[in-house]
């Protein structure tokens, strides 16, 4: 069998060689091996070793060290500004609160260390000359696109409930599925996610939502994710009979997240959009009514959804910019778009072009998750027309006081008394320009000033 060769960064290779030259065994381990086998560039290169923490510290005493994890066997060594974690082979004792082991026992063999890890694809090690050490079928699961716990999945999730969300995130990131036993154990244990800190839950969900397989993962494992965000549960199976929809609320939500086009969005914008899509219809179940024709209606779900989204995001301790951005989008995601230059300019004044571009992206994804009817195609064309005109007006139009051809000094020179009256007059002039009643030229504005 051909032995895989992983190209290690120079510093990671030097660390391995230094540990081995001192008589210790050492391997790169975990995600760097997984990503290398997938042809991806690893973000971190972690090392496991038989060296005890004090031995590692002594060996690299002339380097900058990070010792915050030394009690649990991890010593960070900083080389050329980049930290490398070197962790002693260990086995975890009994876990408390579904998150942290009571004790950590250092061991001398790699096999014992790999057996404590979460998933088979993360339980592989590598060293030059030895190749990949795979004791749990990680390579097979990589080839088959499977997320599988090492050993008994129920035991792994009982030890650390956050592993449930890590399984979801890896499935979304790699576009894999959970093996049946792992999926069943995750569902059985999902209520224990309520014991995990809000910050940890937020970080895992944030990574999941930004991943290429987010929509498919949400569709498959919504009941598991409801352990982290209980408001999801009523959305699952909540029907939407009528001509607009072909999915229940949850499957529509998953499809919308999967349909998001994040091209052109910066990092913050992409995160805001992912969370807005995730929560945009969260209030549909409590707002649902069914008309005499059997069609479902969800009146008021925009505003109620914004309230629920704010509650959820604050509970998860999301960043303030994300809370405000996502809640703002949820609040108007289903509202009609402005028509006509005056209305579009006023929307630019009120919301700004960045928000409106995000709103268009959310509306596209929302519509793409509807039934492919003539009405939906027409509404998508309306969004496209709005986006094109809004983009043009954002470049060429006047929608802020700063863009007016006159300023406060010009008004005072024209006889307006200094103070609040200057601001009031500027706002009136801006409105006149946005409504097309006055051209945005100095002479026209000063002439209009006399009539205000």
Show where each model-derived region lies:
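Catalytic cores of the polymerase beta-like nucleotidyltransferase superfamily
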Residues: 1-452
């Amino acid at each position: 069998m051909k032995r895989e060769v992983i190209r290690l960064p120079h510093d990671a290779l030097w660390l391995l060689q230094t540990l081995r030259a001192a008589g210790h065994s050492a391997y790169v381990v975990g995600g760097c091996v997984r990503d290398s086998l997938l042809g991806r560039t690893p973000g971190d290169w972690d090392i496991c070793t038989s060296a005890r923490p004090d031995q590692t510290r002594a060996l690299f005493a002339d380097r900058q060290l990070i010792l915050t994890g030394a009690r649990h066997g991890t010593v960070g060594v900083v080389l050329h500004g980049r930290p490398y974690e070197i962790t002693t082979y260990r086995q975890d004792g009994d876990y408390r609160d579904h998150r942290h082991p009571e004790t950590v026992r250092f061991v001398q063999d790699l096999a014992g260390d790999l057996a404590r890890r979460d998933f088979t694809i993360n339980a592989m090690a590598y060293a030059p000359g030895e190749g990949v050490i795979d004791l749990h079928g990680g390579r097979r699961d990589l080839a088959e696109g499977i997320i599988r716990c090492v050993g008994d999945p129920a035991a792994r999730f009982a030890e650390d409930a956050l592993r449930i969300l890590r399984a979801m995130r890896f499935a979304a990131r790699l576009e894999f599925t959970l093996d049946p036993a792992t999926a069943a154990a995750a569902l059985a244990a999902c209520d224990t996610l309520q014991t995990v800190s809000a910050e940890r839950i937020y970080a895992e969900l944030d990574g999941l939502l930004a991943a290429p397989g987010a929509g498919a993962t949400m569709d498959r494992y919504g009941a598991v994710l409801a352990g982290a965000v209980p408001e999801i549960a009523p959305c699952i199976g909540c029907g939407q009979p009528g001509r607009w929809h072909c999915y229940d609320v949850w499957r529509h939500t998953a499809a919308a997240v999967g349909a998001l086009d994040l091209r052109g969005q910066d990092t913050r914008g992409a995160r805001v959009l992912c969370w807005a899509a995730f929560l945009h219809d969260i209030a549909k179940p409590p707002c649902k009514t069914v008309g005499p024709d059997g069609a479902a209606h969800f009146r008021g779900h925009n505003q109620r959804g914004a309230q629920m989204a704010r509650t959820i995001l604050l509970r998860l301790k999301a960043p303030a910019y994300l809370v405000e951005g996502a809640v703002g989008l949820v609040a108007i995601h289903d509202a009609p778009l402005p028509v006509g230059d005056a209305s579009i300019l006023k929307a630019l004044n009120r919301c700004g072009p960045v928000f409106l571009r995000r709103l268009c992206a959310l509306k596209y994804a929302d519509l793409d998750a509807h039934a492919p009817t003539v009405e939906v195609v027409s509404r998508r064309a309306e969004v496209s027309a709005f986006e094109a005109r809004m983009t043009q007006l954002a470049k060429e139009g006047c929608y802020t006081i700063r863009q007016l051809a006159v300023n406060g000094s010009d008004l005072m020179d024209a006889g307006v008394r200094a103070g609040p009256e200057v601001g009031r007059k500027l706002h009136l002039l801006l409105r006149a320009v946005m409504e097309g009643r006055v051209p945005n030229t100095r002479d026209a504005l000063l002439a209009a000033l006399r009539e205000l």
